[in-house]
Protein backbone atom coordinates (compact mmCIF):
# COMPACT_ATOMS: atom_id res chain seq x y z
CA UNK A 1 0.00 0.00 0.00
CA UNK A 2 1.34 3.42 -0.95
CA UNK A 3 2.15 5.77 1.91
CA UNK A 4 -0.13 8.80 1.83
CA UNK A 5 1.46 12.24 2.33
CA UNK A 6 0.80 14.10 5.54
CA UNK A 7 -1.68 16.59 4.02
CA UNK A 8 -3.95 13.74 2.88
CA UNK A 9 -3.85 12.15 6.33
CA UNK A 10 -4.75 15.32 8.23
CA UNK A 11 -7.40 16.32 5.68
CA UNK A 12 -9.12 12.98 6.25
CA UNK A 13 -9.32 13.48 10.02
CA UNK A 14 -9.13 17.22 10.64
CA UNK A 15 -6.63 16.48 13.41
CA UNK A 16 -2.96 17.10 14.11
CA UNK A 17 -0.71 15.11 16.44
CA UNK A 18 2.23 16.69 18.28
CA UNK A 19 5.57 14.96 18.90
CA UNK A 20 4.32 14.07 22.39
CA UNK A 21 1.33 12.17 20.94
CA UNK A 22 -1.28 14.86 21.74
CA UNK A 23 -4.21 15.14 19.31
CA UNK A 24 -5.20 18.70 18.28
CA UNK A 25 -8.23 19.77 16.27
CA UNK A 26 -7.26 21.71 13.12
CA UNK A 27 -9.10 24.98 12.60
CA UNK A 28 -7.50 25.78 9.25
CA UNK A 29 -4.62 24.51 7.12
CA UNK A 30 -3.04 25.41 3.80
CA UNK A 31 -0.78 23.25 1.65
CA UNK A 32 2.02 24.67 -0.51
CA UNK A 33 4.44 22.74 -2.68
CA UNK A 34 6.30 21.15 0.23
CA UNK A 35 4.88 22.75 3.42
CA UNK A 36 1.68 22.59 5.43
CA UNK A 37 0.59 25.69 7.36
CA UNK A 38 -1.63 24.64 10.27
CA UNK A 39 -3.75 26.64 12.73
CA UNK A 40 -5.08 24.61 15.64
CA UNK A 41 -8.37 25.22 17.44
CA UNK A 42 -6.38 26.00 20.60
CA UNK A 43 -4.63 28.89 18.81
CA UNK A 44 -1.26 27.24 18.19
CA UNK A 45 0.31 27.65 14.74
CA UNK A 46 2.67 25.26 13.00
CA UNK A 47 4.58 24.94 9.73
CA UNK A 48 5.66 21.39 8.81
CA UNK A 49 7.07 19.49 5.86
CA UNK A 50 4.50 17.62 3.78
CA UNK A 51 6.26 14.29 4.29
CA UNK A 52 5.20 10.67 3.88
CA UNK A 53 7.74 9.37 6.40
CA UNK A 54 7.69 11.84 9.31
CA UNK A 55 6.80 10.70 12.81
CA UNK A 56 3.30 12.20 12.66
CA UNK A 57 2.49 10.51 9.34
CA UNK A 58 3.62 7.17 10.76
CA UNK A 59 1.48 7.68 13.86
CA UNK A 60 -1.55 8.58 11.72
CA UNK A 61 -1.14 5.43 9.65
CA UNK A 62 -0.82 3.29 12.79
CA UNK A 63 -3.72 5.12 14.54
CA UNK A 64 -1.69 5.82 17.68
CA UNK A 65 -2.08 8.73 20.10
CA UNK A 66 -1.60 9.35 23.82
CA UNK A 67 -4.11 12.03 24.75
CA UNK A 68 -6.13 14.95 23.39
CA UNK A 69 -5.55 18.70 23.74
CA UNK A 70 -8.00 20.04 26.33
CA UNK A 71 -8.06 23.50 24.75
CA UNK A 72 -8.92 22.08 21.32
CA UNK A 73 -11.88 20.13 22.75
CA UNK A 74 -11.46 17.17 20.43
CA UNK A 75 -14.83 15.40 20.23
CA UNK A 76 -15.53 11.68 20.49
CA UNK A 77 -16.59 11.75 16.85
CA UNK A 78 -13.19 13.22 15.87
CA UNK A 79 -11.40 10.51 17.85
CA UNK A 80 -13.51 7.75 16.30
CA UNK A 81 -12.73 9.17 12.87
CA UNK A 82 -9.02 9.08 13.71
CA UNK A 83 -9.29 5.47 14.88
CA UNK A 84 -11.21 4.29 11.81
CA UNK A 85 -9.28 2.93 8.83
CA UNK A 86 -11.20 3.34 5.56
CA UNK A 87 -10.65 0.72 2.91
CA UNK A 88 -11.10 1.22 -0.83
CA UNK A 89 -14.52 -0.44 -0.56
CA UNK A 90 -15.52 2.19 2.05
CA UNK A 91 -15.83 -0.45 4.75
CA UNK A 92 -14.60 0.79 8.11
CA UNK A 93 -12.68 -1.29 10.56
CA UNK A 94 -12.03 -0.11 14.09
CA UNK A 95 -8.48 -0.55 15.28
CA UNK A 96 -7.23 -0.64 18.82
CA UNK A 97 -5.38 2.34 20.29
CA UNK A 98 -1.86 1.40 21.40
CA UNK A 99 -0.63 3.93 23.92
CA UNK A 100 2.78 4.27 25.53
CA UNK A 101 3.95 3.10 27.93
CA UNK A 102 2.64 -0.42 27.34
CA UNK A 103 1.10 -2.07 30.38
CA UNK A 104 2.09 -5.66 30.93
CA UNK A 105 -0.71 -7.83 32.23
CA UNK A 106 0.06 -10.50 34.75
CA UNK A 107 -0.20 -14.04 33.44
CA UNK A 108 -1.73 -16.80 35.56
CA UNK A 109 0.70 -19.56 36.34
CA UNK A 110 -1.43 -22.06 34.50
CA UNK A 111 -1.31 -20.17 31.21
CA UNK A 112 1.30 -21.12 28.64
CA UNK A 113 3.17 -18.32 26.95
CA UNK A 114 2.04 -17.43 23.43
CA UNK A 115 4.58 -18.48 20.77
CA UNK A 116 4.83 -15.27 18.77
CA UNK A 117 6.26 -12.83 21.35
CA UNK A 118 8.59 -15.53 22.59
CA UNK A 119 10.00 -15.95 19.12
CA UNK A 120 10.47 -12.20 18.80
CA UNK A 121 12.52 -12.01 22.01
CA UNK A 122 15.38 -13.99 20.55
CA UNK A 123 15.23 -13.43 16.78
CA UNK A 124 17.20 -10.17 16.60
CA UNK A 125 20.78 -10.06 15.34
CA UNK A 126 23.29 -7.40 16.44
CA UNK A 127 24.06 -6.22 12.92
CA UNK A 128 20.51 -5.50 11.72
CA UNK A 129 17.21 -3.93 12.76
CA UNK A 130 15.15 -5.52 10.01
CA UNK A 131 11.77 -6.75 11.20
CA UNK A 132 10.94 -10.37 10.63
CA UNK A 133 7.68 -12.20 10.48
CA UNK A 134 7.26 -15.07 12.88
CA UNK A 135 5.66 -18.21 11.42
CA UNK A 136 2.68 -19.56 13.29
CA UNK A 137 3.51 -22.84 15.03
CA UNK A 138 1.81 -25.97 13.76
CA UNK A 139 -1.16 -27.04 15.81
CA UNK A 140 -0.50 -30.17 17.78
CA UNK A 141 -2.85 -33.10 17.44
CA UNK A 142 -3.65 -35.75 20.02
CA UNK A 143 -1.81 -38.37 17.95
CA UNK A 144 1.27 -36.24 17.31
CA UNK A 145 4.46 -38.05 18.30
CA UNK A 146 7.07 -35.61 16.89
CA UNK A 147 8.94 -33.94 19.79
CA UNK A 148 9.71 -30.76 17.77
CA UNK A 149 6.03 -29.93 17.42
CA UNK A 150 5.23 -30.38 21.08
CA UNK A 151 3.86 -27.29 22.85
CA UNK A 152 6.26 -25.09 24.80
CA UNK A 153 6.59 -25.58 28.54
CA UNK A 154 4.41 -23.24 30.60
CA UNK A 155 6.17 -20.09 31.83
CA UNK A 156 4.93 -17.80 34.55
CA UNK A 157 5.30 -14.04 34.12
CA UNK A 158 8.27 -13.93 36.50
CA UNK A 159 9.96 -16.85 34.72
CA UNK A 160 9.42 -15.15 31.38
CA UNK A 161 10.95 -11.90 32.65
CA UNK A 162 13.92 -13.81 34.06
CA UNK A 163 14.60 -15.61 30.77
CA UNK A 164 14.32 -12.39 28.74
CA UNK A 165 16.78 -10.66 31.10
CA UNK A 166 19.29 -13.49 30.65
CA UNK A 167 19.03 -13.79 26.87
CA UNK A 168 21.60 -12.08 24.65
CA UNK A 169 21.29 -11.24 20.93
CA UNK A 170 23.76 -14.06 20.18
CA UNK A 171 21.63 -16.77 21.81
CA UNK A 172 20.09 -19.10 19.23
CA UNK A 173 17.27 -20.42 21.39
CA UNK A 174 13.74 -20.92 20.10
CA UNK A 175 11.67 -20.42 23.21
CA UNK A 176 8.51 -22.05 21.90
CA UNK A 177 10.58 -25.27 21.75
CA UNK A 178 12.68 -24.47 24.80
CA UNK A 179 13.62 -26.63 27.73
CA UNK A 180 11.70 -26.39 31.00
CA UNK A 181 12.57 -23.30 33.04
CA UNK A 182 14.45 -25.31 35.69
CA UNK A 183 16.87 -26.43 32.93
CA UNK A 184 16.91 -23.29 30.76
CA UNK A 185 17.59 -20.73 33.52
CA UNK A 186 20.84 -22.32 34.83
CA UNK A 187 22.05 -22.86 31.26
CA UNK A 188 21.60 -19.14 30.48
CA UNK A 189 23.24 -18.14 33.77
CA UNK A 190 26.28 -20.24 32.84
CA UNK A 191 26.45 -18.59 29.41
CA UNK A 192 26.35 -15.09 30.90
CA UNK A 193 29.04 -15.94 33.45
CA UNK A 194 31.23 -17.16 30.59
CA UNK A 195 30.53 -13.89 28.74
CA UNK A 196 31.74 -11.93 31.77
CA UNK A 197 34.88 -14.06 32.02
CA UNK A 198 35.75 -13.40 28.36
CA UNK A 199 35.00 -9.70 28.74
CA UNK A 200 37.13 -9.39 31.87
CA UNK A 201 40.02 -11.28 30.25
CA UNK A 202 40.01 -9.74 26.76
CA UNK A 203 38.38 -6.30 26.77
CA UNK A 204 37.36 -4.57 30.03
CA UNK A 205 35.85 -1.57 28.18
CA UNK A 206 32.34 -0.39 28.93
CA UNK A 207 30.31 -0.01 25.71
CA UNK A 208 29.01 3.43 26.62
CA UNK A 209 32.41 4.72 27.74
CA UNK A 210 34.09 3.35 24.61
CA UNK A 211 31.46 4.94 22.36
CA UNK A 212 32.00 8.31 24.09
CA UNK A 213 35.75 8.03 23.42
CA UNK A 214 35.23 6.98 19.79
CA UNK A 215 32.83 9.87 19.16
CA UNK A 216 35.22 12.35 20.79
CA UNK A 217 38.05 11.17 18.53
CA UNK A 218 35.81 11.40 15.45
CA UNK A 219 34.92 15.06 16.00
CA UNK A 220 38.31 16.21 17.32
CA UNK A 221 39.97 14.69 14.23
CA UNK A 222 37.61 16.79 12.08
CA UNK A 223 38.43 20.10 13.73
CA UNK A 224 35.65 20.33 16.34
CA UNK A 225 36.39 21.80 19.78
CA UNK A 226 35.26 19.59 22.69
CA UNK A 227 33.04 21.30 25.28
CA UNK A 228 32.27 20.18 28.85
CA UNK A 229 29.47 22.25 30.36
CA UNK A 230 27.62 22.09 33.72
CA UNK A 231 24.90 19.51 34.26
CA UNK A 232 23.04 21.91 36.57
CA UNK A 233 21.80 24.83 34.46
CA UNK A 234 19.67 27.93 35.18
CA UNK A 235 15.96 27.24 34.73
CA UNK A 236 15.93 30.39 32.60
CA UNK A 237 17.90 28.51 29.91
CA UNK A 238 15.03 26.05 29.50
CA UNK A 239 12.51 28.88 29.14
CA UNK A 240 14.71 30.58 26.53
CA UNK A 241 14.59 27.34 24.53
CA UNK A 242 10.82 27.87 24.27
CA UNK A 243 9.97 25.34 26.98
CA UNK A 244 7.51 27.21 29.19
CA UNK A 245 5.07 25.85 31.75
CA UNK A 246 2.37 25.33 29.10
CA UNK A 247 4.41 22.81 27.11
CA UNK A 248 4.57 19.04 27.56
CA UNK A 249 8.38 19.10 27.71
CA UNK A 250 8.22 21.36 30.77
CA UNK A 251 6.69 18.47 32.73
CA UNK A 252 9.77 16.37 31.96
CA UNK A 253 12.26 18.76 33.60
CA UNK A 254 14.02 17.65 36.80
CA UNK A 255 13.95 20.88 38.84
CA UNK A 256 16.37 21.26 41.75
CA UNK A 257 14.77 24.50 42.94
CA UNK A 258 13.03 27.45 41.31
CA UNK A 259 16.29 28.66 39.75
CA UNK A 260 18.16 25.44 38.80
CA UNK A 261 17.39 22.21 36.97
CA UNK A 262 19.18 19.20 35.52
CA UNK A 263 19.82 19.89 31.86
CA UNK A 264 17.28 18.16 29.56
CA UNK A 265 19.47 18.89 26.51
CA UNK A 266 22.94 20.20 25.60
CA UNK A 267 21.78 23.00 23.29
CA UNK A 268 21.58 25.98 25.74
CA UNK A 269 25.25 26.00 26.74
CA UNK A 270 26.37 25.25 23.17
CA UNK A 271 24.42 28.35 22.09
CA UNK A 272 26.35 30.37 24.68
CA UNK A 273 29.69 28.95 23.52
CA UNK A 274 28.92 29.78 19.88
CA UNK A 275 28.19 33.40 20.79
CA UNK A 276 31.31 33.80 22.94
CA UNK A 277 33.73 31.94 20.65
CA UNK A 278 32.53 33.95 17.67
CA UNK A 279 34.20 36.99 19.29
CA UNK A 280 37.46 35.10 19.78
CA UNK A 281 38.06 32.59 16.97
CA UNK A 282 38.04 32.82 13.18
CA UNK A 283 35.08 31.13 11.50
CA UNK A 284 33.65 28.70 11.00
CA UNK A 285 33.19 27.84 14.69
CA UNK A 286 32.93 24.06 15.18
CA UNK A 287 32.11 22.63 18.63
CA UNK A 288 30.64 19.47 20.16
CA UNK A 289 29.79 18.01 23.56
CA UNK A 290 29.19 14.49 24.88
CA UNK A 291 27.44 14.28 28.23
CA UNK A 292 24.46 13.14 30.31
CA UNK A 293 21.00 14.71 30.15
CA UNK A 294 17.88 14.12 32.25
CA UNK A 295 14.16 14.01 31.48
CA UNK A 296 11.14 12.52 33.19
CA UNK A 297 10.49 10.22 30.26
CA UNK A 298 7.78 7.58 30.11
CA UNK A 299 9.07 4.09 30.73
CA UNK A 300 9.62 2.10 27.54
CA UNK A 301 12.05 0.34 25.25
CA UNK A 302 13.27 3.59 23.63
CA UNK A 303 13.39 6.11 26.51
CA UNK A 304 15.50 6.70 29.62
CA UNK A 305 15.32 9.31 32.36
CA UNK A 306 19.14 9.54 32.40
CA UNK A 307 20.69 9.37 28.95
CA UNK A 308 23.84 10.46 27.12
CA UNK A 309 23.83 12.90 24.20
CA UNK A 310 26.32 14.08 21.63
CA UNK A 311 25.51 17.44 20.07
CA UNK A 312 27.69 19.00 17.37
CA UNK A 313 27.28 22.31 15.59
CA UNK A 314 29.09 24.54 13.14
CA UNK A 315 28.48 28.28 12.70
CA UNK A 316 29.62 30.54 9.87
CA UNK A 317 30.67 29.47 6.39
CA UNK A 318 29.78 26.09 4.89
CA UNK A 319 26.57 25.72 6.90
CA UNK A 320 24.41 24.05 4.26
CA UNK A 321 22.06 21.10 4.35
CA UNK A 322 24.36 19.22 1.98
CA UNK A 323 27.33 19.62 4.35
CA UNK A 324 25.20 18.63 7.35
CA UNK A 325 23.95 15.46 5.67
CA UNK A 326 27.49 14.62 4.52
CA UNK A 327 28.82 14.93 8.09
CA UNK A 328 25.97 12.81 9.48
CA UNK A 329 26.66 10.15 6.83
CA UNK A 330 30.37 10.15 7.66
CA UNK A 331 29.59 9.85 11.38
CA UNK A 332 27.14 6.95 11.06
CA UNK A 333 29.34 5.17 8.51
CA UNK A 334 32.13 5.47 11.09
CA UNK A 335 29.85 3.68 13.57
CA UNK A 336 28.65 1.23 10.87
CA UNK A 337 24.96 2.15 11.31
CA UNK A 338 22.46 2.18 8.42
CA UNK A 339 20.09 5.15 8.31
CA UNK A 340 17.75 7.32 6.27
CA UNK A 341 16.97 11.04 6.52
CA UNK A 342 13.36 12.28 6.56
CA UNK A 343 11.85 15.72 7.12
CA UNK A 344 9.97 16.53 10.33
CA UNK A 345 9.31 19.39 12.75
CA UNK A 346 9.69 19.99 16.48
CA UNK A 347 8.48 22.51 19.04
CA UNK A 348 11.93 24.01 19.72
CA UNK A 349 13.50 24.39 16.27
CA UNK A 350 10.60 24.10 13.79
CA UNK A 351 11.69 22.22 10.66
CA UNK A 352 14.13 19.39 11.37
CA UNK A 353 15.75 16.42 9.64
CA UNK A 354 15.05 13.15 11.43
CA UNK A 355 17.76 10.50 11.19
CA UNK A 356 16.01 7.11 11.23
CA UNK A 357 17.18 3.51 11.60
CA UNK A 358 14.05 1.62 10.65
CA UNK A 359 11.34 3.00 12.95
CA UNK A 360 13.85 4.17 15.57
CA UNK A 361 14.72 7.89 15.56
CA UNK A 362 18.46 8.34 16.14
CA UNK A 363 18.69 12.12 15.82
CA UNK A 364 17.07 15.40 14.89
CA UNK A 365 19.24 17.72 12.80
CA UNK A 366 18.72 21.42 12.06
CA UNK A 367 19.86 23.89 9.42
CA UNK A 368 19.84 27.39 10.95
CA UNK A 369 19.15 30.20 11.32
CA UNK A 370 15.92 29.62 13.26
CA UNK A 371 13.75 32.09 15.18
CA UNK A 372 15.12 30.79 18.49
CA UNK A 373 18.61 32.13 17.65
CA UNK A 374 17.64 35.68 18.65
CA UNK A 375 17.17 34.55 22.26
CA UNK A 376 20.87 33.59 22.35
CA UNK A 377 22.42 36.42 20.37
CA UNK A 378 23.16 34.27 17.30
CA UNK A 379 22.83 35.97 13.91
CA UNK A 380 24.83 33.70 11.61
CA UNK A 381 23.92 30.52 9.71
CA UNK A 382 24.63 27.25 11.50
CA UNK A 383 24.06 23.51 11.28
CA UNK A 384 23.84 20.93 14.04
CA UNK A 385 22.49 17.60 15.24
CA UNK A 386 22.13 15.56 18.42
CA UNK A 387 22.33 11.78 18.91
CA UNK A 388 21.42 9.66 21.92
CA UNK A 389 24.34 7.30 22.61
CA UNK A 390 22.18 4.61 24.19
CA UNK A 391 20.06 4.44 21.03
CA UNK A 392 23.21 4.13 18.95
CA UNK A 393 24.37 1.24 21.17
CA UNK A 394 20.94 -0.40 20.94
CA UNK A 395 21.31 -0.50 17.16
CA UNK A 396 25.01 -1.44 17.13
CA UNK A 397 24.57 -4.43 19.45
CA UNK A 398 21.02 -5.54 18.64
CA UNK A 399 19.61 -4.94 22.12
CA UNK A 400 15.85 -5.37 22.47
CA UNK A 401 15.65 -2.93 25.38
CA UNK A 402 17.53 0.38 25.60
CA UNK A 403 18.16 -0.20 29.33
CA UNK A 404 20.80 -2.77 28.37
CA UNK A 405 22.82 0.10 26.87
CA UNK A 406 22.31 2.57 29.73
CA UNK A 407 24.11 3.46 32.95
CA UNK A 408 22.84 0.59 35.05
CA UNK A 409 23.57 -1.83 37.88
CA UNK A 410 21.35 -4.47 36.28
CA UNK A 411 23.27 -4.77 32.99
CA UNK A 412 26.89 -4.43 31.95
CA UNK A 413 27.46 -4.21 28.19
CA UNK A 414 23.99 -5.67 27.75
CA UNK A 415 24.71 -8.66 30.04
CA UNK A 416 22.55 -9.16 33.12
CA UNK A 417 24.55 -8.76 36.34
CA UNK A 418 21.92 -10.59 38.40
CA UNK A 419 23.51 -14.03 38.11
From Swiss-Prot:
It is found in: Cytoplasm. One of its GO terms (biological process) is tRNA aminoacylation for protein translation. Residues 100-157 are annotated as: Disordered. Its main location: cytoplasm. It catalyses: tRNA(Pyl) + L-pyrrolysine + ATP = L-pyrrolysyl-tRNA(Pyl) + AMP + diphosphate. PROSITE patterns: AA_TRNA_LIGASE_II. GO terms for molecular function: ATP binding; pyrrolysyl-tRNA synthetase activity; tRNA binding. Keywords: Aminoacyl-tRNA synthetase, ATP-binding, Cytoplasm, Ligase, Nucleotide-binding, Protein biosynthesis. GO terms for cellular component: cytoplasm. Residues 120-141 have a biased composition (Polar residues). Residues 142-154 have a biased composition (Low complexity). Disulfide bonds: none annotated. The keyword Ligase applies. Its EC number is 6.1.1.26. It holds the Pfam family tRNA-synt_2d. Catalyzes the attachment of pyrrolysine to tRNA(Pyl). Pyrrolysine is a lysine derivative encoded by the termination codon UAG. Belongs to the class-II aminoacyl-tRNA synthetase family. HAMAP family: Pyl_tRNA_synth. This is Pyrrolysine--tRNA ligase. The lineage of its organism: Archaea, Methanobacteriati, Methanobacteriota, Stenosarchaea group, Methanomicrobia.
Amino acid sequence: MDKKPLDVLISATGLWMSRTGTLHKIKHHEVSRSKIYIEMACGDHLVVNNSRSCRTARAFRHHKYRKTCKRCRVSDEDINNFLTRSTESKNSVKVRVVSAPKVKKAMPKSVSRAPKPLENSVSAKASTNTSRSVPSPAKSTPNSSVPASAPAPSLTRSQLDRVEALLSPEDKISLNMAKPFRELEPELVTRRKNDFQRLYTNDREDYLGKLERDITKFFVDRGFLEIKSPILIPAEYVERMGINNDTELSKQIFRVDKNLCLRPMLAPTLYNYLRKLDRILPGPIKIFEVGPCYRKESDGKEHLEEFTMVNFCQMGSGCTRENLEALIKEFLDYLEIDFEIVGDSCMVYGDTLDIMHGDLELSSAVVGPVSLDREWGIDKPWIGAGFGLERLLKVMHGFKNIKRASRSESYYNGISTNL
